[in-house]
Regions:
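Bacterial N-terminal signal peptides
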Residues: 16-24
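Second-shell loop/turn segments in exported
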Residues: 177-180, 252-255, 313-318, 336-345, ...
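...with weaker cross-activation on analogous glycine-rich loops/strands in unrelated enzymes
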Residues: 186, 366-435
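Loop/turn positions that initiate beta-strands
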Residues: 190-193, 262-271, 401-405
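Bacterial N-terminal signal peptides that target proteins for export
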Residues: 2-15
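Active-site nucleophilic cysteine motif
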Residues: 331, 341-361, 365-372
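Boundary regions of SH3-family modules and the immediately adjacent low-complexity/disordered segments
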Residues: 32-162, 168-171, 176-178, 194, ...
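Aromatic- and glycine-rich peptidoglycan recognition patches
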Residues: 33-51, 211, 219-240, 245-249, ...
């Protein structure tokens, strides 16, 4: 939120941005608006100016900022391709009625493999052998029945997906407390899962979801009838979370739906016919949306309960139109958020960041960077060691708003070009570039950041550009690259 009093340079900058946006919104087919002044240069990040930290600046520079990159029918077709062609996406509705023990063991051990490198605890000490033995025993692989009938459930709260059935945090080096190597991802309220195994201590469930299979705390899942689970949210109306996060209203009457965090792109069914005179969990509902959320009863069974989603929260009745302007708007809602490896810290990592942005437009992406980079369902431009530096630089110069740029283990979203540089927004733990003396500066960005792409260094000798593995575009297949840019 802006301060009540703004310094004159800041007022002038905001006025320039506002004027530029006002002009550009007049017509999607109008000539590009006069771009705002970039404002004062900021320290540390190479080439960064004040206005670069606003989505309005980049929207004013973008051609056809209000023209959809994909129409709803094209998004639906792309999602269909994703579900049919991408091996990382799984349809839990198509699981067999009985899963053989050999298949289940293979599914679990594909994930739950102890790393060969040393692991350290939060205290900086090596993980004891006894701790490892206890964690591996908790997999309960020896007790797998000959056949397992999947159960179906809905996630009732934001919950971690873990490599092993444990809350033990482990790290690759002493002193690191951010990159927990057992943290895989997270699931959100209303996500659908198939439960196929339980840990020896009974506290963890091995689940399949559409984009990931991993261990989740048992208290985060409500088990229900298959058809009820798979049919949840199939009919509108809806509210789609369009803010970085939203929260349900606090309610002591029903703690199970009180203050729940809902992340960008989550879509919840609305109980549109809720009687106006009937309070919801002790509160009259005119200032909120009455949404339906899953909860657990005392036996862990699924119940569906009303909850209030205040109208002050950033939501929409449907997925947003996939335009460059709105892509920028959605990405910048995360600006400055702390980096959370595997959705740790209640936040997200680089691939989670772009997934949640595109989810608010109804676009399905794989969970991890490797799967996203290789997905055959998108408009992919791949790179190999045979591609020259010039070829890579030309591809970077042609990036458009929303294009996703992949290097090993990382993804960035293009936001525009200015002064011969391509700029990206990305959720990053690190980042580095060469200083005036030619030495590499290792930055601890550790959050959603805006940086130029060209100066970013992967090592002392390799640029990010040299390590690009692919560029994924949200365009109808076969759409040619546009090379013209706003000056």
């Amino acid at each position: 939120m802006f301060q009540a009093t703004l310094h004159p340079p800041r007022r002038r900058l905001l006025l320039a941005v506002a004027l530029a946006v006002g002009v550009s919104m007049g017509s999607a087919l109008a000539q590009p608006a006069e771009v705002p002044d970039p404002g004062p240069a900021l320290p540390y990040i190479v080439g960064l100016h004040e206005a670069y930290l606003t989505p309005q600046y980049w929207a004013a520079r973008a051609e056809h900022a209000d023209t959809p990159l994909l129409l709803p029918a094209q998004i639906a077709a792309q999602n269909t391709r994703m579900r049919s062609r991408d091996p990382s996406i799984q349809d839990i509705a198509r699981l067999p009625r009985q899963v053989p023990a050999a298949q289940l063991r293979q599914d679990i051990t594909a994930l739950s493999v102890w790393p060969t490198r040393p692991l350290y605890g939060a205290d900086g000490q090596p993980v004891p052998a006894a701790t490892r033995a206890g964690i591996e025993a908790n997999l309960a692989l020896a007790s797998l029945p000959a056949q397992t009938r999947p159960q179906y459930g809905l996630v009732v709260q934001r919950a971690a997906l873990r490599t092993f059935p444990t809350r033990q945090r482990v790290f690759s080096r002493p002193g690191d407390t951010d990159i927990d190597r057992f943290q895989e991802s997270a699931l959100f309220p209303g996500d659908k899962v198939a439960v196929v195994h339980r840990s020896a201590d009974g506290q963890w469930l091995f689940v399949h979801s559409e984009r990931y299979s991993a261990w989740i705390p048992y208290e985060a899942v409500a088990i229900g009838e298959r058809d009820t689970v798979l049919g949840y949210g199939a009919q509108g109306p809806y509210r789609v979370i369009t803010g970085a996060t939203a929260h349900t209203a606090h309610t002591p009457e029903e703690p199970r739906v009180s203050g729940l965090q809902l992340d960008m792109g989550v879509r919840l069914p609305v109980l549109a016919d809720w009687p106006a005179e009937q309070p919801v969990n002790g509160q009259q509902a005119h200032a909120a949306w009455v949404v339906q959320l899953p909860v657990r009863d005392a036996d862990g069974r699924l119940q569906l309960r009303p909850a209030l989603l205040p109208r002050s929260q950033d939501t929409a009745a449907d997925y947003l139109p996939l335009t460059p302007r709105l892509l920028l708007q959605q990405a910048y809602k995360f600006l400055g958020e702390r980096y959370g490896w595997g959705h740790d810290y209640g936040t997200r990592d680089c691939s989670g960041f772009v997934s949640e942005i595109y989810r608010s437009f109804g676009v399905l992406l794989p969970r991890n960077t490797g799967a996203q980079a290789d997905s055959p369902a998108l408009d992919r431009r791949g790179f190999t060691d045979q591609d020259s530096a010039r070829t890579r630089e030309q591809a970077v110069a042609q990036l458009q708003v929303g294009d996703l740029v992949y290097i090993p283990g990382h993804v960035m979203m293009a936001i525009g070009q200015v002064d011969g540089r391509t700029w990206v927004i990305h959720d990053t733990a690190g980042g580095s570039w060469n200083g005036p003396d030619g030495r590499r500066i290792a930055a601890h960005l550790n959050g959603v950041s805006v940086t130029p792409l060209e100066p970013m260094m992967a090592s002392d000798t390799l640029r990010y550009i040299d390590r690009i593995t692919s560029i994924q575009r949200m365009r109808p297949p076969g759409t040619p690259q546009r090379t013209s840019q706003t000056p």
